[in-house]
Amino acid sequence: MKAHALALFILLAACGGSPPPDAGKADIVIAVIPKGTSHTFWKAIHAGAVKASQELGVEVIWKGPAREDDRDAQIAEVENFVSRGVSGIVLAPSDDKALRLPVTDAMRAGIPVVIIDSGLDSKDYVSFVATDNYKGGRLAGERMVVKLGGKGKVVLLRYMEGSASTMERERGFLDVLAENPGIELASANQYAGATAETAYQASENLLARFKSPEGGLTVDGIYCPNESSSFGMLRALQDSGLAGKVTLIGFDASEQMVRALENGEFDALVLQDPLNMAYLGVKTMVSHIRGEEVPPIIDTGVTLVTRDNMSDPRVAELLRPDIDKWLN
């Protein structure tokens, strides 16, 4: 028996003493690269990726630029993970054209890519997991038309050129306005930029163009297509004493924005489901790596939220996702 045990020990040592699959490092390593890391939206994306990694038994590496307009940093992250030979990449492209070649190069190198959140000017990827952003823009436009009774002046504070997701939200909104001749589009050429601070400055500049001699506004409605532009405009309206005096519709949510919806400073918010989006992005990648067929497009849903429905359990979960459960 002793000789048999010794022989078995030597055999295991020669094979590296391979532990059970769940006893060591995960055999699937997925890089999740967001557009940025500062907004609440991206924290929810991070939480969803962590949730998937824990439930599926894979390793997730979270790495992305601090600012959403840092395309070069995001490209460098993609190239770095390709060099490291990760099992797959889940990417939210900051620019629909600038990230096209890095994604193609990754796919050609045998590193599959799942796109989340924002589209790519290419079909050279495994799957696209995202909100129907055009529909979200239309929901905002339809709400604006109803609130203004089909008549009034509206401004759009755009986000940033090259961001496919927000460009679709803007397009959906503008298409609804074009279908309603009683609504006048007073401005659609101002860009907020990638941060809440640049959005605040852009919002102040935009509001200054439409101030009345009495200190009010000569427009009736404002639409902003993402978290930073929405929060920047909210701050500018608050600082001008005009919050709640114009129909403000935003996209996405932070704690400050939810409170502003509760007190009437936002009329409505269009919400995505970022936690589930990232969860499904990682899950789709794992399924692909394991040889399963995955759909080319997965719609993660979009919801218009007002004070009338914000207390519904599912809506409340979208407004305040349990990020801390997965990140702390």
Pin down the residues of each PLM region:
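Hydrophobic beta-strand scaffold residues
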Residues: 60, 110-113, 185
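Hinge/beta->alpha junction and helix N-cap segments in small-molecule ligand-binding domains
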Residues: 33-47, 62-73, 95, 118, ...
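Bacterial signal peptide processing site
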Residues: 15-19
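Hydrophobic alpha-helical
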Residues: 82, 91-107, 173, 192-260
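Sec-dependent bacterial lipoprotein signal peptides
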Residues: 1-13
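Flexible loop/hinge segments that line or gate small-molecule binding clefts
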Residues: 96-135, 143-146, 153, 159, ...
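Hinge/cleft segment of the Venus flytrap/periplasmic-binding protein
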Residues: 164-165, 176-178, 276-328
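Short, hydrophobic alpha-helical segments
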Residues: 82, 144, 148, 207, ...
